[in-house]
Amino acid sequence: MSTPFKMERGVKYRDAAKTSIIPVKNIDPNQDLLKKPEWMKIKLPASSAKIESIKNGMRRHGLHSVCEEASCPNLHECFNHGTATFMILGAICTRRCPFCDVAHGKPLPPDPEEPQKLAETIQDMKLKYVVITSVDRDDLPDRGAGHFSECVKAVRELNPNIKIEILVPDFRGRVTQALEKLKDNPPDVFNHNLENVPRLYKEIRPGADYGWSLKLLREFKEMFPNIPTKSGLMVGLGETNEEILQVMQDLRDNGVTMLTLGQYLQPSRHHLPVARYVPPTEFDEFRDKANEMGFEHAACGPFVRSSYHADLQASGGLVK
């Protein structure tokens, strides 16, 4: 009889240790993988000085970026431009989504000094637009919403002219309570990712619920009708184009005005494999459909991620 897997608090579990406890066993690390097409190859910048500067600044203040923790393919480009997406509430997620490279485990309690550290780091970096996201914190009574609110408050106090976008989890089972905490310090853009299509949620987003996510986006929009709401999707996980179009329509029906759509990339052999690589022309077609549906801004392209050039997205610029 095998010994049950026991996690230690504060320890990051990745790759096989993470995926071994996912309910749906659908990952074979030895399977053949699709060859990456030419359009998915990234040219790295010649200099890494700016990249190291941002990494060192994060370490100095004990902060995390989702760019590093989730192994984002755009890290070099964004860091080289002096931008980063800050990840609050630690670097250990209570969920274990098999598409995501963020570590799973039992997280430590929130750092009460993190809001001030975040505000000071943003001030040091002289940012005009910032994205703040977090891991899922299903272990907290408010799922981390109060900490989000405190971070927004601290950042605004020290950086009065900044624009703030928050990319939030689904606040599992606590949507109403979470929004009550967020309403005291609302962002300039409210972002929550649906990720993919409801048919694949059990496989892709164990612990999440498509209806909860739509409810969160809808109720925030009802509370703050003048604040843009935004959501992101990945393609290449086994969905059909028709299913993606239906999700896009569901987003519009729930008041979402900004969309990001990008190619899923497998972080390691212990994550879900890429089912197909979507060519750039199809992303252009998705963007055209999004415009027809009434999205005010749609960033669609192979390397587009939820916070990729978020400042340009918010100002209405073309991102692809």
UniProtKB/Swiss-Prot annotation:
Radical SAM core domain ranges (all copies): 79-296
Requisite cofactors: [4Fe-4S] cluster
Class of the enzyme per the UniProt entry, highest EC level: transferase
Record carries keyword 4Fe-4S: yes
EC number of the protein: 2.8.1.8
GO molecular function: 4 iron, 4 sulfur cluster binding; lipoate synthase activity; metal ion binding
Domain of life of the native organism: Bacteria
Family the UniProt entry places it in: Belongs to the radical SAM superfamily. Lipoyl synthase family.
Stated name of the protein: Lipoyl synthase
Chain's gene name: lipA
